Amino acid sequence: DTIERARQLDAFYIRDKYGEYASKHPRFFTNMDGSFAVGDPVSLCAAGDCLDVDIMAGNTVDEFRSFIPAADDKELSAKAEGIFGEKAEKFLALPGARESDGHGRYASVSGIEVTAKAMFSRLKEHFPDKRYYYYRFNPDIPGEDNPGSFHSCELWFMFETLAKCSRPYVGRHYDLARQMCNYWCNFIKTGDPNGRDADGSQMPLWEEYTDGSHSGMTFVSEGSVPEGSDGELVAFLTEHVKNKI
């Protein structure tokens, strides 16, 4: 019950106790304290029990992948039937559904992308006048470790603080960071990320996400690239999640 006593605890005791806690309390989930966080954010948004505001959400491409673990195609089919029921065959016929990464992970997509888009669709039902913007972050991230587009690496870009990072960023990264910071600042000020770049030129149009357009923005090494639709697999899974939340 004191810092002094905590410092006296054996490291292996702390490790084992943390292991017990983590087995019952999944990490990277909402810690609901009943005061500030009174429920699961996705469920609250799906029910319209949230603030009536414009929202921007997105993800880095390589983080939090969702997939179906299976040893082979037969097990994949059985699991698909358990998850999707009568729509299993439709799922299995989609491009990418039967593709494995070589480690028994099939139909890999970004879980955050699918959840965010499903949440946007639900929110639009409750707040039709509000705008919802989706982004996908996937530039090259330099370094000897070849890290990919890892969790929160977009923060250096959106805050335009690349120089404070030890990774060897170069000109194209700074150009992307400038654009992203502009988009974020515009959204914070007006609820709309669109506007002009530092040289006065119009930045690529970032359209809001709707059930009809599925629009968003992909940030790559060459800059900001508007996207106009989802792939069939993402669209199917988004609709599935929408009906579950």
Annotate each language-model stretch with its function.
Residues G85-T115, S121-H126, Y133-P139:
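Alpha/beta-hydrolase fold catalytic core
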Residues L51, E86, V114, R178-Y183:
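A non-catalytic, amphipathic alpha-helix used as a structural packing/dimerization or gating element
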Residues C50-F91, S221-I245:
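C-terminal, loop-rich substrate-recognition/catalytic regions characterized by aromatic stacking residues
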